[in-house]
Amino acid sequence: MTETNSSRRSFLLKSMAAGLGLSTLGSLPLPAFARKSNMKLGLVTYQWGKDWDLPTLIANCEKSGLLGVELRTEHAHGVETNLSSRQRREVKNRFADSPVTCVGYGSNFAYHYTDQAEVRQNIEGTKEYLTLCKDIGATGIKVKPNGLPEGVPKEKTIAQIATSFNEVGKYAKELGQLVRVEVHGKLTQQLPNMKAIFDQVTEDSVKVCWNCNDQDLMAPGLEANFNSVKHWFGDTVHIRELNVGDYPYQQLMNLFNGIDYEGWILLEARTTPADRVAAMKEQLEIFNSMTNA
């Protein structure tokens, strides 16, 4: 980001804080809004932002106070690898002229397939989108393992996934990007399996993106599962609505506070509220309450 864009963003953040009646923004690069925690709430365009074009998405994030966004693939914002160099600069400038941070890109690339040509296709696709992330001013791409195929030894698939992560991770590091591995997939979202994968990951640009699955609560429990992979946490976490279901979000926030986590907590909402901006504001209020606990 240029010095001009950085100053512009700082001005926008301070103006937003003043408009919300917040007098203690200080010199923080992003608005902590007087929270004790340094965690920040943002949005994944999974459902609530899927039909918003880019100007609308940025405007609605500004209105709600969710000042970070992970752009999901094949959504209405249209940020894909077919963008020209000029269009990529335009996307980057839109974010630079806003208090909203483009955290990264949410892809569906995965590397567990038995067909090695499909694995290679996913690796090369990841690299193309990592270049896009760099060009638009984002800092990384979300990928995932998505299962352990039947009929293949688990250890073989785990090693294949880790090897793929190492290849795309090396490429990401050269671009100054991160590979954020969503804890995902019928079997791979079980934390012992995710740990087994990361035990073979050698690139420090490859990070775990916690995903708030029911499997997190399997024995030996949330805290133990959290601790088993916290060494690899990056700067993104996916949550669902904080007031829906029975996932122990307050305990999770306490655990992240306990390790002084300073990354993005990204809302991957699944409900269909009549007013999504109002719903985003509500989630921010709940989040602030939980992170002040």
Where does each model-flagged region fall?
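Acidic (Asp/Glu)-rich catalytic clusters
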Residues: 36, 58-63, 83-103, 127-137, ...
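N-terminal small/glycine-rich loop or linker at the start of catalytic domains
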Residues: 33-44, 102-112, 148
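Histidine-acidic metal/acid-base catalytic patches
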Residues: 2-42, 49-65, 188-293
